[in-house]
Amino acid sequence: MQILKDRILNEGKHLGNGILKVDGFINHQVDPALMNEAGKEFARLFNGVGATKILTAEISGIAPAVYTGQHMGLPIVYARKRKPVTMPDQVLLTLAPSHTKGRTVELIVSPEYLAGGEKVLIIDDFLASGATILGLVKLAEIAGAKIVGIGALIEKTFEGGREALSYLNVPIVSLAAIKSFDNDQILFE
């Protein structure tokens, strides 16, 4: 998606160690117009997968997931990283390493919002190593739900996440695929 690539080139910054700072328009300050366009594009690309629900991880996956859900007419569920007091004692829980946090995080979903028989489309901000998305896949599997597609705003193809998820045999879509940070220059596929 060219408008996303342009924003990454103009405002994104490689911080080293494969970390891309895009917090001016995706994951701290959010550009609603950009997320709306991304949601439209995901809705177009995943139109035929038969999804009944969208699953993402808090916090940065929420904006693209909400706009995708709006354009697809689907509810979204986001995995929390801390269990609130309002959540039941029995939860769906898995652990996933976080590249940006530098530690393992919990991913928690209430079973009342993710159940067996659901057809789940995962939408997130990044696809890098695939660790967070694999955690979301595990939550869906624990619930008895089926993954029908995976979408990410930005993919860092050099980190191997797509390959780690290929066993699922579902469409995997990224709107901006980065092949390298060559001398801190962002290069797209």
Tell me the role of every PLM-derived stretch:
Residues T52-K53, K119-L121:
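Structural motif
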Residues L74-V120, I186-F188:
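Short, glycine/charge-rich flexible loops or terminal/linker lids adjacent to PRPP-binding catalytic cores
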Residues A63-M72:
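Short Gly/Thr/Asp-enriched flexible loops that form oxyanion-binding sites at enzyme active sites
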Residues G50-E58:
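Short glycine-rich phosphate-binding loop at a beta-alpha junction
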Residues D125, G130:
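Conserved G/P- and acidic residue-centered "switch" motifs that form tight phosphate/ATP-binding loops
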Residues M1-G50:
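Active-site-facing substrate-recognition patch
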Residues Q2, G18, V137-E189:
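PRPP-dependent phosphoribosyltransferase catalytic core
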